[in-house]
Amino acid sequence: VREQTYSNWEMIIIDDCSTDHTVELVKREQKKDSRIKLIQLEKNSGAAVARNTGMKHAKGKFIAFLDSDDQWLPNKLEEQIRFMEENNYTFTFSSFAIMDQYGNLTGKTNRAVKKADYYDILKRPGTIGCLTVILDREKITDPYMPNIKTRNDFATWLKILRNGHTAYGLDKVLAYYRL
């Protein structure tokens, strides 16, 4: 994230009771960059609680998600936010490439469709990758994820689309998803 060509970002890291050295690493990075914030959850609560906690603490206009094992390309925020602003879009996603567990690209890519509504993603649930989404929270007022074990992001996209929004795809690989 720190390598983004778009510099007006804040990174809210939610530590969901990790057992590695995440907290120490983040605290070191915070000393180098004031845009990094750390929130430690008291108990392991899962992805939905972590994402919702991050959204509650976010101050910016745009919300994006990145899990610890995935990666954004350095131009992701700049290109996708420009795409949103030039077209007045409130919900966007991009194409992404697949990495194996070691971080090697597999040659597989999930291509973004031009646009998707509620019925489109019901037919193709894997259309929108969470790591590629950017939401305009000034126009999408309830982006919070239901506290369910799996597919909480998919349930959220359905809710947003059911409320009349359309998701627009940018067919450029801007992220890497780790299997």
Segment roles from a protein language model:
Residues 15-24, 43, 67:
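A conserved acidic beta->alpha catalytic loop
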Residues 20-28, 71, 75:
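Acidic helix N-cap motif at the loop->helix transition within catalytic regions
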Residues 63:
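Short aromatic/hydrophobic "clamp" motif used to bind/position activated sugar donors
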Residues 67-71, 95:
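The conserved acidic donor/metal-binding loop of glycosyltransferases
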Residues 75-106:
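Conserved donor NDP-sugar-binding/catalytic core segment of glycosyltransferases
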